[in-house]
């Protein structure tokens, strides 16, 4: 089974692209959805211990947690040390299940793929991109997003140009869904002929 790592900076259209891979019959692992899941379960005690006051009704309150970590790189590192091992375990379970199902290709949707060294654990990388103007417009339309918060998020992410340079495939979401579907078909055709690279 070939594993494609899907990544892209905030607001690039990565979640939509992941859904379209799913529509094409490809198993898709969603790291963000897994974070939501562990924030409602296994990560709660460790996060409350590290960041007191960030849980409400037995769940991590993402807004409260964000206030504690978004401008503090040491706090962000502590959070990652809690969350990343849990995510790796869920990720491996997904791959085992996808392989057992006989899927020829699986997609792992990981926002910080390059930033966490995740490109070494996939066979090829798909980077989702759009113009800076469209990106900013999409992000600032989100609830609870401010220009300052956006700048702090972007400062932690590898620049889009560098991600595109390191990608095996690039999906441009600037022109609507049909062109994205066509790009996905091309990627899946190419992936069928690619050798496995991950260990």
From Swiss-Prot:
Catalysed transformations (reactions): 3'-dephospho-CoA + ATP = ADP + CoA + H(+)
Q: Where does ATP bind?
A: 11-16
GO terms assigned for molecular function: ATP binding; dephospho-CoA kinase activity
Q: In which pathway does it act?
A: Cofactor biosynthesis; coenzyme A biosynthesis; CoA from (R)-pantothenate: step 5/5
Q: What is its main location?
A: cytoplasm
Could you name the domain of life of the organism this protein comes from? Bacteria
* Domain DPCK: start-end pairs: 3-199
Q: Where in the cell is it found?
A: Cytoplasm
* Broad EC category: transferase
Single GO cellular component term: cytoplasm
Q: Which InterPro entries match?
A: Depp_CoAkinase, P-loop_NTPase
Instruction: Quote the EC number.
Output: 2.7.1.24
* Record-level GO BP terms: coenzyme A biosynthetic process
Question: Which PROSITE patterns does the UniProt entry name for this protein?
Answer: DPCK (PS51219)
The UniProt keyword set, sorted, is: ATP-binding, Coenzyme A biosynthesis, Cytoplasm, Kinase, Nucleotide-binding, Transferase
Q: Which NCBIfam families match?
A: dephospho-CoA kinase
The record describes the protein's role as: Catalyzes the phosphorylation of the 3'-hydroxyl group of dephosphocoenzyme A to form coenzyme A.
Of which family is this protein a member?
A: Belongs to the CoaE family.
Name it: Dephospho-CoA kinase
Tell me which species this is from.
Answer: Rhodopseudomonas palustris (strain HaA2)
Read off the lineage from the record.
Bacteria, Pseudomonadati, Pseudomonadota, Alphaproteobacteria, Hyphomicrobiales
């Amino acid at each position: 089974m070939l594993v494609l790592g899907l990544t892209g900076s905030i607001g690039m259209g990565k979640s939509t692209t992941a859904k379209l891979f799913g529509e094409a019959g490809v198993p898709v692992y969603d790291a963000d959805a897994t974070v939501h899941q562990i924030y409602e379960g296994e990560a709660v005690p460790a996060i409350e211990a590290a960041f007191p006051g960030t849980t409400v009704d037995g769940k991590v309150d993402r807004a409260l947690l964000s206030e504690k970590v978004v401008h503090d790189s040491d706090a962000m590192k502590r959070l990652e040390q809690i969350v990343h091992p849990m995510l790796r375990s869920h990720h491996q379970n997904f791959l085992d299940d996808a392989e057992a199902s006989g899927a020829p290709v699986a997609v792992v949707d990981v926002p910080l793929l390059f930033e966490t060294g995740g490109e070494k654990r996939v066979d090829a990388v798909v980077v989702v991109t759009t113009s800076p103007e469209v990106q900013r417009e999409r992000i600032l339309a989100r609830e609870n997003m401010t220009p300052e918060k956006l700048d702090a998020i972007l400062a932690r992410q590898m620049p889009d140009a560098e991600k595109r340079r390191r990608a095996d495939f690039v999906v441009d979401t600037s022109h609507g869904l049909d062109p994205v579907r066509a790009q996905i078909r091309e990627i899946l055709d190419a992936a069928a002929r690619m050798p496995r690279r991950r260990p």
